[in-house]
Amino acid sequence: MDRPTPLQWNQAIQTPDFRTESGFTQMPPRDILLTIGDEIMSSANSFRCRYFEYLAYWPLMNQYFEEDPEFKWTQAPRPRLTDKSYKHNYYDERISLEERLERTAAKDFVTTEVEPMWDAADVMRVGKDLFIQHGLTTNRKAMEWFKRYYPDLRVHAVNFPGDPYPIHIDATFVPLRPGLIINNPHRRLPEEQRKIFEANDWQIVDAAPPAHEVPPPLCYSSVWLSMNCLVIDHKTVCVEASEVHQMEQMDKLGMNVIPVPFRDAYAFGGGLHCATADVYREGGCEDYFPNQVADPTLV
């Protein structure tokens, strides 16, 4: 296990295009690093406060580059994040929850299509397929960029209309092993987007309810971080130790469950999956969706 280099996150961030008063944190490498094959790519985050977050991982990337002659170290095109990249007054506090849900269903998000923007935590990698959540942090232009950059992979755009704040996929749609996914019951994948899963005998089951009614203090995520588990292999999963319902469900689904106390870290950026990024894998790239059908999610 390697750890990022601490940075001074409370200092202002400034570029020729914007200024913001502080950074974010280095707790969630899942948001920044995307591993595909022998390549680790730094993301093109849409939050201005995360513009220089990749610097926390720069020493590790440089180390991997020097140690492994086959390692590819890349950076996605950096977005400028000018005012044109966002819809103004999108987060007006006078907008009701019902209106937010209507926006999500209509795929009306704060980001525009001026430039590709994406967080790595919006990308669910399943062998030869990339399922990318279209939401507040990743736009459709980013998916088109992925399609061109990885022509040998299939890129799918998915969205979850029940989520009023769709940011990242790991508390919504989580693969546990080939053929099995747990889905947030409040944010179900629409029926028309399930065709590719059904054609390849994947089972999508509702996730167990969270054990808590409210998030811990200062946490900006929902109680559904209960789903934000770390899958070690096809039989082993780490779950936050207080999430008794989720652990019970994992056990019934045939997983070996490792409870990990982690709730106190939620305020710094997320759950167990958020706090990790895999940098080394064994085996080849499998095709878990060989049966291709008329798929509305395909980019």
Predicted regions mapped to residue ranges:
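The feature marks the mature, well-folded catalytic cores of soluble enzymes
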Residues: 1-299
